[in-house]
Swiss-Prot record:
Recorded topology in the membrane: Multi-pass membrane protein
Gene: htpX
Subcellular location field: Cell membrane
Name used for this protein in its record: Protease HtpX homolog
TM region positions: 19-39, 41-61, 156-176, 198-218
GO biological process terms, semicolon-separated: proteolysis
Organism listed in the record: Thermoanaerobacter pseudethanolicus (strain ATCC 33223 / 39E) (Clostridium thermohydrosulfuricum)
Cofactors: Zn(2+)
Organism taxonomic ancestry: Bacteria, Bacillati, Bacillota, Clostridia, Thermoanaerobacterales
């Protein structure tokens, strides 16, 4: 298999993002159309559904980075208070040939980090306070280089859009569950032969079961090879694979789960924020394997 150039990888990520948005739109329309038909909302319901899908796709494309940052409680890193962090981000961005991304801080003891945005000109890097406390300069530089590699490779667009879409799926799951319990209560007060309520209950139950699986499949669609590529690319940007390898060793030794995160955003982070090992549907390769590959690199 021939190696792909950076430009080919970037173009592939953009194509996958558009394909993902189109596929998700069709699935969402199919789900919405059922409710339009069931409640007999007619043409008005179809028009409103179409408007919602277009609006949501625009938000997912244009505002997904802001949503991702807000969902984890990230705040802008004060340049004076976090001078060293800003300095490292600027150095690595310059070496990678991209504009300096916005820098955010997340009040969290778990050492972790992620990048978000739609392109190198509209990107952000977020690190936890735990990461800053545990890492020395070389290790922090390695982590930042990994995240900036995601920005340069344009992984961030697909990763962030997937996070927003997965969030909607989880929200729909929760709405279905509430509707199901509400429907059960209502059905006891109505005629036992109310077939409509029974149908809604069945659909709600099915969706509540498959929704988590849908999220896992979506997350796994983001290839684990992207993490290997970002590790290697980051190491070459700073000419040092050992900084990131050492950082991953420290990150891997911390098993306490992150306080503020969800299945929708887990794939954004450099390491699994739930503090547990995953094999099936995992979006991150094993940290041990990542460290092994980094230490085998020659600069």
């Amino acid at each position: 298999m021939s190696r792909k150039t950076l430009y080919e990888l970037q173009a592939e990520n953009v194509r996958k993002t558009y394909l993902f948005i189109v596929t998700f739109s069709l699935i969402l329309f199919a789900i919405g159309y059922f409710f339009v038909w069931y409640f007999n909302w007619g043409l008005t319901g179809i028009v409103l559904l179409a408007i919602f899908i277009v609006l949501y796709n625009w938000i997912a494309y244009e505002q997904s980075d802001k949503i991702a940052l807000a969902s984890v409680g990230a705040i802008p890193a004060n340049p004076e208070e976090y001078y060293v962090l800003h300095n490292i981000v600027e150095e690595v961005a310059l070496a990678a040939g991209i504009p300096k991304p916005n820098v955010y801080i997340m009040e969290e003891s778990q050492p972790n980090a992620f990048a978000t945005g739609k392109d190198p000109k509209h990107a952000s890097v977020c690190v936890t306070t735990g990461l800053l406390q545990m890492m020395n300069r070389e290790e922090l530089q390695g982590v930042i280089a990994h995240e900036i590699s995601h920005i340069r490779n344009r992984d961030i667009l697909l990763m962030t859009v997937v996070a927003v879409v997965a969030g909607l799926i989880i929200l729909l799951r929760d709405v279905m569950l509430r509707s199901m319990w509400w429907g059960m209560g209502e059905s006891r007060r109505r005629d036992k032969n109310d077939n409509g309520a029974i149908i809604l209950l069945i659909i709600g139950l099915i969706f509540s079961i498959i929704a988590p699986l849908i999220v896992l499949i979506i997350r796994s669609a983001i290839s684990r090879q992207r993490e290997y590529l970002a590790d290697a690319t980051g190491a070459f940007i700073v000419r040092d694979p050992y900084g990131l390898a050492s950082a991953l060793e420290k990150i891997g030794s911390y098993t306490r789960p992150m306080r503020v995160t969800s299945d929708a955003t887990a794939h954004l982070f450099i390491s699994n924020p739930f503090g547990r090992a995953e094999k099936l549907f995992a979006t991150h390769p094993p940290i041990e394997e990542r460290i092994k590959r980094l230490k085998s690199l020659t600069m």
